[in-house]
């Protein structure tokens, strides 16, 4: 990892992903050895939804959605209580997170240059539009072997992205066009669709059901 956030894509550039036409994604490939940590230092954005998600080389994801990110002392999380955006947070990606540890995500295991893991910062419906000019992306610091290195911002953000494909039953369950969709339950105002409705491989949003209910 030589620089931070080499890939950015949104409806204005790639016109992909779900469920918001006003989404912005920032992507970082991860190739990390044992003991490496990645620390994200960021600001809560003015947006409908935001999350930090990591994926293994096979596409299995873990997420910290907006409301679960604890603010730094003296800051407030606007998804937890009424507050202006701009509060500070710190999130750590590490290989040995304790169960229930706040602001921590698991480091993708088994990453190589040919099969990297992925770090994604998702922001839906940011005020003022998407892109780096409107969304304050977190600063990335790599900690390894007792030293810390803050990654400089990439000079461009159009690096090619080749998301992993979900294989086996997960891929077949999420693939569209192979049969009729199951009807929703009757006499219910709200129901939770199966995750396979949305997960068609690649870097699927772990928080899709939460976003739809928000």
Give residue ranges: language-model regions:
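A compositional/structural signature for long, glycine/proline-rich flexible linkers
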Residues: 1-214
């Amino acid at each position: 990892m030589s620089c931070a956030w080499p890939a950015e894509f949104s409806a204005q550039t790639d016109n992909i992903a779900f469920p918001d036409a006003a989404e912005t994604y920032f992507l970082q490939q991860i190739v990390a050895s044992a003991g490496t940590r990645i620390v994200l230092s960021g600001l809560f954005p003015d947006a409908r939804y935001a999350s930090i998600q990591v994926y293994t080389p096979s596409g299995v994801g873990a997420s910290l959605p907006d409301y679960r990110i604890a603010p730094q002392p003296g800051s407030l999380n606007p998804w937890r209580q009424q507050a202006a955006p701009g509060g500070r947070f710190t999130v750590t990606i590490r290989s040995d997170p304790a169960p229930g540890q706040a602001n921590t995500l698991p480091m993708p295991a088994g990453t190589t240059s040919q099969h990297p893991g992925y770090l994604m910062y998702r922001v839906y419906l940011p005020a003022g539009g998407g892109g780096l000019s409107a969304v304050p992306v977190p600063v990335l610091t790599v900690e390894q072997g007792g030293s810390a290195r803050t990654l400089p911002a990439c000079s461009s953000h159009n690096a090619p992205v080749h998301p992993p494909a979900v294989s086996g039953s997960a891929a077949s369950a999420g693939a569209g066009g192979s049969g009729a969709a199951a009807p929703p339950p009757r006499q219910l105002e709200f129901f939770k669709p199966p995750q396979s409705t949305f997960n068609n491989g690649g870097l699927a949003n772990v928080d899709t059901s939460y976003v739809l209910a928000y």
